[in-house]
Amino acid sequence: MKGISRMSIREVSEVLNTEPSEEFLKACAQDERLGIQNLIVRYYKEWEARLVEAERIEALLREEKQLWLNGYLHIAGIDEAGRGPLAGPVVAATCILPAKFNLPGLNDSKKLTESKREKLFQQIKEQAIGYAVGSAEPAEIDGLNILQATKLAMKRAVEGLKVRPHFLLIDALELPSLKIPQKGIIDGDALSASIAAASILAKVSRDHLMGELDKLYPEYGFAKNKGYGTREHLMALRRCGVSPIHRRSFAPVQQQLDIV
C-alpha cells in the first residue's frame, strides 16, 4: 500500500471501511488534511458504536449462555404479537438462535421501526437454527379467553419447530402443557436475544397477515391499524358492523353486537 500522504481521501475511506491496521490509523490521525481528519473521527465513532452494540447483544445472551453451560443446546425463545387488538388472530413465534449470529440492532420488536423489523425478520430466518410461527384465531380467542389463546398459539409454534428444543425461554408466561424445561421471563423480549428474535418474527408475521386480511375487509383499515382499536377502526366498526375476524368477546366489538 502506498503511503497515506500519497492517497486520496476516497482511497483512505475505502481502507477504513475494511480492517485498517493500527499503523494506518496512526498515520490517518497525523495527516493534516481536513477530509482525512473527518474520516478518522467518523471511524472511531462507528467503532465505539459497534463496541457498545456488541456489549448490548452480549447482555441479551446472559440467559442463553447460562443454559448452554448447563448442557441445553437448542434454546427456543417464544413471544407473541396481537393480544390487544379487536380483530385478527394472536400470533406467536419461537426461534432457536445459534451461539454465533450477526443480527445488529436485535431488540424487542416494539422498540424497532417497521423497516428495521422487516430487515431483521429476514436475517433471523436466514440465521436461526430453527423457527416457527403459530396462531389462535378470533373464534378460539372468544372461546378460551386471550390468555389461554395466547398459550395455545405459543404451543402451536413450538410444535411447528423442525428442530427439537431442549429449553424454552418464554416472554412472561409458562406453558405447562409442554413437557419441556422452561422459564418465563417478565419483559423477556428486552432481556433475552432468543425472545427478542421471536418477538420480531411474531410481530412481522402478524403484520403481514393483517395486510392480507385488509384486502378481504378493506373498510376497517387493517393494513394500517393491525386490528387495534384506533379511532378510525372504531368508526368503521360502527358504520360497517362486525366482520368475521373481529373478536366478539372484546368490549368494543361486544358493544356493537349488543346494538345490533
UniProtKB/Swiss-Prot annotation:
One GO cellular component assignment for this chain's record is:
ribonuclease H2 complex
E.C. number: 3.1.26.4
The protein's predominant localisation is cytoplasm
Q: Where is the RNase H type-2 domain?
A: 73-260
Tell me its cofactors. Answer: Mn(2+); Mg(2+)
What are the UniProt keywords, alphabetically? Cytoplasm, Endonuclease, Hydrolase, Manganese, Metal-binding, Nuclease
Keyword Cytoplasm recorded: yes
Which reaction does this enzyme catalyse, per its entry?
Endonucleolytic cleavage to 5'-phosphomonoester
> Looking at the keywords, is Signal present?
no
Function in brief: Endonuclease that specifically degrades the RNA of RNA-DNA hybrids.
The molecule here is called: Ribonuclease HII
- Can you name the source organism? Desulfitobacterium hafniense (strain Y51)
Chain's gene name: rnhB
